[in-house]
Curated annotation (Swiss-Prot):
Underlying gene: pheT
One Pfam match: tRNA_synthFbeta
Enzyme class per UniProt: ligase
Location of the protein in the cell: Cytoplasm
Name assigned to this protein: Phenylalanine--tRNA ligase beta subunit
Keyword list, A-Z: Aminoacyl-tRNA synthetase, ATP-binding, Cytoplasm, Ligase, Magnesium, Metal-binding, Nucleotide-binding, Protein biosynthesis
NCBIfam families hit by this protein: pheT_arch
Highest rank taxon of the organism: Archaea
Organism, scientific name: Thermofilum pendens (strain DSM 2475 / Hrk 5)
Amino-acid positions noted as binding Mg(2+) in the UniProt annotation, renumbered to this chain: 323, 329, 332-333
Reaction(s) catalysed by this chain's protein: tRNA(Phe) + L-phenylalanine + ATP = L-phenylalanyl-tRNA(Phe) + AMP + diphosphate + H(+)
Listed EC numbers: 6.1.1.20
Keyword Protein biosynthesis appears in the UniProt entry: yes
Gene Ontology CC: one annotated term: phenylalanine-tRNA ligase complex
InterPro entries reported for this sequence: aa-tRNA-synth_II/BPL/LPL, B3/B4_tRNA-bd, DNA-bd_dom_put_sf, Phe-tRNA-ligase_IIc_bsu, Phe-tRNA-synth_IIc_bsu_arc_euk, Phe-tRNA_synthase-like_B3/B4, Phe_tRNA_ligase_beta2_arc, PheRS_beta_core
Amino acid sequence: MPVVEVKLWDLERLTGASLDESTVRDLLPRLKCEVEEVSGEDVVYEATHDRPDLYSAELLSVYLKGLLGVEDGLPRPRVGSAEGVAEVEGPAYRPYAFFAVVRGVSLDDEAIRQLMQLQEKVHLTYGRNRRKVSIGLYDLDGIKLPVRYVAASPETRMKPLGFAIEMTLREVLEKHPKGVEYGHLVKGHGEYPLIVDAEGKVVSFPPITNSEDFRVTESTRDVLIDVTSTDPEAGRRIISLFAHAVAVRGGEVRPLRLKGALDEESPRMEPEEVVYDVSMNRDLLGLDLGVEETVRLLRAMRMDAEPAGNGKVAVRYPYFRVDILHPVDIAEEVAMGYGYERIEPAVIPPLHPGREDPIEVFTRALREGMVGLGFVEVNNYMMTSASLMFDAMLLPRQPIVEVENPRHEAYHALRTWIVPQLLRLMSSSKHAGYPQRVFEAGDVAIPDESRDNRVREERRLAFAVAGKGVTLTDGLAALKGLFRQLGVSFKLEKAEHPSFIAGRVARVVTEAGDAGIVGEVHPQVLVNFGLEVPVVAGELNVEVVMKCYLARLGGA
């Protein structure tokens, strides 16, 4: 979780309340923040990934005001008249830009540090390392409105942040630290994102760096904020978040009218609305809290709330609250306002007794079956190398799950199949004599963009038989013996696979679909592993075989 550092004295001046270590340690956990350290004026805490509004002192102080009883209800920054328009005609791969002006802020070194911290923490988390969202803050003095978000030539020149000389955008990607770090987000495209003012002066090269000419300093009184994004909803919420945060430092928000990719006013300052049924207090929290108490607690959590009749509450919450997706999230706010420490734990009887996962039960049966067929079980690490899985097996490289900074080249990726590791084991066991019959039941990891975590895990059963005179028949005999024990039928279909001899390899097909492959290992693969006898190997998808087995039981 993001680690945030704030100053106690800064929180005191923003809240208008006296704070000490005890108060901080009491209140921050009620905002789902884990206090790591309070040392003198330094407060260090962890905030959750879904609460970017807690990544700096500005909005943290707003919530502390609610818990301390200083203020309640929605935070209401001053909002003035629109400043004009902003033209949005950026590159297609990063099409959206949102802007806000905040006038009359009062900044010192700590205020600037907090806003920069908020910017970087949002970049790393919600912004997906600037890929999804990037933010810029500028001294508006010297910028002539309206601003434009455009697609620019890589040869366009600017003075990047921290540099005293101008360079082309292409040079920024090569020489500026942020260009080196984030250049991959724009490299390969013919045009780069750029923000310029009405006179054509470069304000920013998002998502890389800002212009040195418009750096925010302690003398800055008017701030221009931009958010560029690949997702319009994400951009809207983050520009609203930053407008609120900067306004906490004493400013007035001035919207801009977007023209181009979107036609709307930015930032959005109006709240979201949801109707909350107070019966959820008991159902989810075990608390008997009526409408009036629920309203009071939600207002303390900096939301507007009022009775809506029939045991319901109309709730309005800040648009930048990206963590609120459902009335269940409002129940969490009620719990936070009430105080987690006041909720007494209760042991809830389980709805059903625990049980072993069916896949584990079935895998154990397969292990016993293979042992009964004369195989010896082995276990390999799930970590392996691409060279073993692909190069040694005569396969083209495919997407795999890799470790970013591996300690050892032999263990830099998660395996996508098990047979290569069995061959490696046989290679190191040549002294043990033949025939050798080994198997392993374990998991593999296959990249799959359709999954939430982009990885599909499969349980596999792999086996190998090595020895003089070993042929495909030996592999088929093992398969038939195993399937006969399960009472499951299968058939073989012609297959092609570079790791096996052509014409001596087959797909194993069941009623539930393809279950795996079996074949005689290709001579070149044997050479790659230093094996001097024929080997037949196979690998099955355990879940497919289990479906057939369970279907047979269901039909019995």
